[in-house]
């Protein structure tokens, strides 16, 4: 298994990440890399080009990624998936960031909810339980691309001035911070929601 992250700042066009998003991503990648015993290869550029090079270098037979839901990313990912499937490389995509797929919790007319309470009633109270997270791969089964991978700093995500000092006191990026926020929400927010 070769865990990778690709920072695609080429395809986004007008959807460029702001400074706070980049700060968050920088620290989330640090946390992810640590959780994988530093076995996370990082790249910047066009995902199709990078994945093509990796499939050739490592004789890849299967590619797995978490789905993105912005329209431009859906379009890009469909093209990439088709390209690799034509090359007889299996592509498996997963919901890695939402409780339910957006198209599974909709109003009776098929349109998305715009108000939280009806969404909550249909999604949280009446839908199937979200899938459980898959187990983290064993660290000894992970590869690291030492030739082409770049450092987190090479992604150039951190702003030049340190306006984020106050934010660092309030927010904890990464999986651990997310688990803490979910626990607080379940105990203090969701349990008391009417």
Predicted regions and their residues:
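Trp/Phe/Arg-rich N-terminal binding region typifying the photolyase-homology
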Residues: 1-130
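Glycine/tryptophan-enriched, flexible segments
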Residues: 112, 118-194
């Amino acid at each position: 298994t070769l865990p990778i992250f690709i920072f695609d700042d080429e395809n986004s066009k007008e959807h460029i990440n702001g400074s706070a998003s980049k700060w968050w991503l920088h620290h989330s990648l640090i946390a992810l890399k640590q959780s994988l015993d530093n076995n996370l290869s990082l790249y910047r550029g066009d995902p199709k080009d990078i994945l093509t090079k990796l499939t050739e270098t490592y004789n890849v037979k299967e590619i797995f990624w978490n789905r993105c839901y912005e329209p431009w990313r859906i379009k890009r990912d469909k093209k990439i998936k088709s390209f690799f499937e034509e090359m007889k490389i299996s592509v498996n995509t997963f919901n890695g960031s939402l409780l339910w797929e957006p198209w599974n919790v909709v109003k009776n007319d098929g349109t998305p909810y715009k108000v939280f309470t009806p969404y909550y009633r249909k999604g949280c109270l009446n839908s199937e339980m979200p899938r459980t997270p898959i187990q983290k791969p064993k660290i000894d089964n992970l590869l690291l691309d030492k030739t082409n991978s770049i450092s987190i700093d090479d992604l150039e995500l951190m702003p030049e001035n340190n306006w984020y000092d106050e934010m660092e006191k309030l927010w904890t990026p990464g999986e651990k911070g997310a688990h803490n926020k979910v626990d607080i929400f379940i105990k203090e927010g969701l349990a008391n929601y009417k």
